[in-house]
Regions:
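A short beta-loop-beta micro-motif enriched in histidine and acidic residues
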Residues: 44, 56-71
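A short, N-terminal "cap"/entry segment at the start of jelly-roll beta-barrel domains
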Residues: 2-47, 80, 96, 114, ...
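Glycine- and acidic-residue-biased ligand/ion/polar-headgroup-sensing regions
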Residues: 66-83, 93
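Ligand-binding loop in jelly-roll beta-barrel domains
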Residues: 86, 100-126
Length: 134
């Protein structure tokens, strides 16, 4: 019984996180992998998701209520936060966003191949992972 309830709660949390992160159509497919409270850091949790961008896919401007660590798994992506230049990252490269960064550009660098990233978000428990840029 506990295992079934726990599994259902994890699935629901993953669905909520995916809704939090996913933007408009073409922005990418978010796949929740894990959300876990951090032992020894009261009130904080880590969430891991993959985001797969279709060819030419992009997200609208947004901000995360989290420190976000991005690792490019496949393809290449272009990232830009306010005050910084656009950066093109290839598979095997990483990127960091702080909670105060407005993420202006997050897109697949290719119009012909998909791109996939792993995002690890460290945030307050229960806080939305993503909010629109203001």
């Amino acid at each position: 019984m506990f295992r079934t309830t726990f599994t259902a709660l994890l699935a629901a949390a993953g669905a909520i996180l995916a809704d939090d992160i996913q933007d408009a159509p073409g922005s990418g497919t978010v796949t929740p992998l894990l959300t876990q409270a951090l032992a020894g850091i009261e009130g904080k949790e880590v969430s891991m998701v993959t985001v797969t961008y279709p060819p030419g896919g992009a997200s609208s401007a947004h901000r995360h209520n989290a420190d976000v660590f991005v690792y490019v798994l496949e393809g290449s992506v272009v990232m830009q936060v306010d005050g910084g230049a656009p950066v093109t990252l290839e598979a095997g490269q990483a990127f960091h966003e702080s909670p105060s960064d407005v993420h202006r550009v997050s897109r697949n660098a290719s119009d012909t191949k998909p791109a996939k990233i792993l995002a690890i978000l460290v945030k307050d428990q229960g806080a939305p992972a993503t909010v629109p840029a203001s």
